[in-house]
Amino acid sequence: MEKMTINQLPSRTWNRLGVNEATIDWDESATVVLPEESAEKTDMLIASDAAYARKRVTVQAEKGAKKSLFQILRTAGKLHVQTELTAEDGAEIELIQLVAPGENALVYDEVIGHCHGSGRIVLRQVTLGHGDVYAQTGIGLDGENAAFAANIGYLARKNKTLDMNLVVNHWGKKTKCEINASGALNDAAKKIFRGTIDFK
C-alpha cells in the first residue's frame, strides 16, 4: 500500500490551506488493469468490483470531425479512469460523464485533453453516489482559437470527499475557456475545488 499524490496545483500556495494536492491510498500490486479502449462507440460503462482497478480510454477527433462520448463510472472498490482526448483543427469532442461510486468506494477520474488548431473540447460532468470522488482535468489549448468548456454538477453526501482540480494551459492565441461548477453538500460532506487558467 502506498500513497498516491494527485490533483496537484501547478503553483503551490500556503500549506495550511490544505489545497496544494490530494493523496489517496493505492495498492499498485493489487491493481487490476482493465482493457484499454479507443472509443469509437458513443457510450461506455466502466465498472469494477475489484479492490483496485485502472482503465485508460483514448478519443481522437480528426480535422473537422465531431465526436461525443458518454461514460458511466461505477465501482465497489477503488477505480482510476484516465480518458485522453485529442481534438484536431476544427474538431470537437464532447465528453459526458456520470461518476457514481458505491458506498465507501472511490473514483479517481482523470481527463487529459489536447486541442490543436481551433479544436474544442466540452466536458459535462455529474458526480453522484455514496463514495469519494477525485477529479483531475488537464487541458492544453495548443492552437489558435482552441477552446475548452466545462459544466460540472455534484452532490456529495454523509462524510464523503469531492476533490476537483482543473488546469487549463493556454498555449495558442485567441484561446477560450469557460468553467462552471455548482452543486450541493449534504451532512458532513466536504469539497475542494481548484481551477487554474494559465496563459503561457
Model segments located where?
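Short, Gly/Pro- and small/polar-rich lid/capping loops
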Residues: 1-29
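Conserved beta-strand/loop scaffold segments within soluble protein domains that form the structured core
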Residues: 26-200
